[in-house]
């Protein structure tokens, strides 16, 4: 449970930043992949 919450909490802000940068390249289906990497 803690690991899931930590992952979501850490991925939330990163996903926003990655989405803004990925928006220039390819933002189709990529956010999920970036979220996993984060």
From Swiss-Prot:
Domain of life per record: Eukaryota
Q: Briefly, what is this protein's role?
A: Mating pheromone for A2 allele.
Lipid linkage positions (S-farnesyl cysteine) = 35
Its keywords, alphabetically, are: Cell membrane, Lipoprotein, Membrane, Methylation, Pheromone, Prenylation
Q: What is this protein called?
A: A2-specific pheromone
A single Gene Ontology CC term: plasma membrane
What membrane topology does this protein have?
Lipid-anchor
Task: Mark the residues carrying the PTM Cysteine methyl ester.
Answer: 35
Question: Propeptide per record: which residue ranges?
Answer: 36-38
One example of the protein's molecular function in GO is:
pheromone activity
Organism of origin? Mycosarcoma maydis (Corn smut fungus)
Task: Tell me where the transmembrane regions lie.
Answer: none
Q: Where in the cell is it found?
A: Cell membrane
